[in-house]
Regions:
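Membrane-interface helix termini and inter-helical loops of multi-pass transporters
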Residues: 23-35, 90-93, 142-152, 200-219, ...
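Transmembrane alpha-helices of multi-pass small-molecule transport proteins
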Residues: 33-83, 110-114, 133, 164-171, ...
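Helix-helix packing/entry segments at the starts of transmembrane helices
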Residues: 11, 15, 44, 81, ...
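Hydrophobic transmembrane alpha-helices of multi-pass small-molecule transport proteins
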Residues: 53, 74, 114, 123-144, ...
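Specific transmembrane alpha-helical segments of multi-pass solute transporters/efflux pumps
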Residues: 17, 21-22, 54-104, 140-142, ...
Length: 293
């Protein structure tokens, strides 16, 4: 049995790893001439991640799961793996790593709102205020971003991914309790990787041949760290904490991404972008403050 402290540590580890993902993705698929094609890249990355989980599927005899659980895990895979990662990879070509992290900072608020809808309770005034503040922050980010730091299309893709991930966080807990975090991680990663592998397959052979040693090293570190280890840590941790409490730790994601983008990619940040990110963080604080009062 995982203690609450262990669950918190695992959840924190997952978010720190995910905070590094936009930096690695932006470095590999950025819109420069040497940037790798985004769709084959994400297909290869998650195809390799699925291979890492394949032995667990055999060990867990997942084909014996009831149809209801198989349908739910397929839905979780669609939202949490495909729906989050494919838009993020494409959006990363025109959105800086720090901007990606700031946009993903809206996820805790989305989780809180979705949980309210699922529990059929009306969000309070505090949640509505938090939502308006968050929307204002997103608007500032969009207005403050230059063409190289955040195109409108790229921002929309990142926000769609944030919505898909938040939905995953809300619908997956019952499955985690019934089937265990390890097997659910294996199933969601494998099933969610298949669509990305399928759409990226035509370009993967050429991509694999053109990648340098450094690019392969970054790719494999992302496969093992931000894809395999992170989803395991998140699912185990969130099973112990619950979706809303685990959402607290998503505060860290924008901080890691912004710092990584500035340090490793030399990404500039305007005052308007920082203000927008601050409003998003403030909206998340309001949503959590309302929840605990």
């Amino acid at each position: 049995m995982t203690t609450r402290a262990q669950s918190a540590a695992l959840t924190c580890t997952a978010v720190l790893l995910w905070g590094c993902a936009p930096v690695g993705t932006r470095y590999l698929v950025g819109d420069s001439q040497v940037g790798l094609p985004a769709v084959p890249f994400i297909g290869l990355r998650y195809g390799l991640a699925a291979l890492c989980f394949a032995p667990l599927l055999v060990w867990g005899k997942v084909w014996r799961w009831p149809r209801a659980d198989l349908a739910l895990v397929a839905l979780c895979a669609l939202f949490g793996v495909t729906g989050y990662n494919l838009p993020n990879a494409i959006g990363a070509r025109t959105v800086g790593a720090g901007m990606v992290g700031l946009l993903n900072g809206v996820e805790p608020l989305l989780i809180a709102l979705m949980m309210a809808l699922r529990q059929r309770r009306i969000p309070g005034a505090g949640t509505l205020v938090a939502g308006l503040v968050g929307l204002a922050g997103i608007a500032l980010l969009a207005l403050g971003a230059g063409p190289a730091m955040g195109s409108a299309r790229g921002i929309a893709l990142i926000l769609f991914g944030a919505f898909a991930w938040s939905l995953y966080c809300v619908i997956v807990p019952p499955l985690l309790y019934r089937r265990g975090a390890v097997l659910v991680s294996a199933m969601t990663m494998t099933l969610g990787s298949l669509p990305m592998l399928a759409v990226g397959a035509p370009g993967i052979p050429h991509l694999a041949l053109q990648m340098t040693t450094l690019q392969w090293e970054i790719m494999l570190s992302m496969v093992l760290g931000t894809s395999v280890l992170a989803i395991l840590c998140w699912n185990i941790g969130s099973a112990g904490l619950g979706a809303e409490q685990a959402g607290w730790f998503l505060y860290l994601l924008p901080l890691v991404s912004v710092a990584g983008g500035a340090i490793f990619l030399h990404e500039p940040l305007t005052l308007m972008e920082l203000s927008g990110g601050g409003l998003i963080m403030l909206s998340v604080f309001f949503s959590q403050r309302w929840r605990t009062t």
